[in-house]
UniProtKB/Swiss-Prot annotation:
SUPFAM superfamilies: Multidrug resistance efflux transporter EmrE (SSF103481). The gene is arnF. NCBIfam families: PRK02971.1-2 (NF002816). The keyword Transport applies. This is Probable 4-amino-4-deoxy-L-arabinose-phosphoundecaprenol flippase subunit ArnF. The keyword Chaperone does not apply. Heterodimer of ArnE and ArnF. It is a multi-pass membrane protein. One of its GO terms (molecular function) is carbohydrate derivative transmembrane transporter activity. Keywords: Cell inner membrane, Cell membrane, Lipid A biosynthesis, Lipid biosynthesis, Lipid metabolism, Lipopolysaccharide biosynthesis, Membrane, Transmembrane, Transmembrane helix, Transport. One of its GO terms (cellular component) is plasma membrane. Belongs to the ArnF family.
Length: 128
């Protein structure tokens, strides 16, 4: 069950990251504090997506807490790397994100996935 909670945490955190990225690219920069506050108070789509991203992170932390009750930290922590993979893929697939494909990034994703497989695949006992 810990693995399920961990996957929920990763998926929710990835969606939250995409939401925050969208909001950050559409809201005024925080260096223009009054414009930023005015945009938040107007509670338009950008501000609502920012709020959803922040709430998503909060929900992700709850799922992560549940994960750590059921799964060893050494395994649970490795799951977090899947968020990088999900956000990378989503940025290329979703319209408007302009994520770029590169062989270097693909190699990095392959390394992450290989590492996860090494950590999570069951160990087999060898007979001598």
């Amino acid at each position: 069950m810990g693995l399920i909670w961990g996957l929920f945490s990763v998926i929710i955190a990835s969606v939250a990251q995409l939401s925050l990225g969208f909001a950050a690219s559409h809201l005024p920069p925080m260096t223009h504090l009054w414009d930023f506050i005015a945009a938040l108070l107007a509670f338009g789509l950008d501000a609502r997506i920012l709020l959803l991203g922040l709430l998503g992170y909060l929900l992700s932390v709850f799922c992560w807490y549940k994960t750590l009750h059921k799964l060893a930290l050494s395994k649970a922590y490795a799951l977090l790397s899947m968020s990088y993979v999900l956000v990378w893929i989503a940025s290329m697939v979703l319209p408007g994100w302009e994520g770029t494909f590169s062989l270097k990034a693909l190699l990095g994703v392959a390394c992450i996935m290989s590492g996860l497989m090494l950590i999570f695949l069951p160990m087999t006992k060898q007979r001598y």
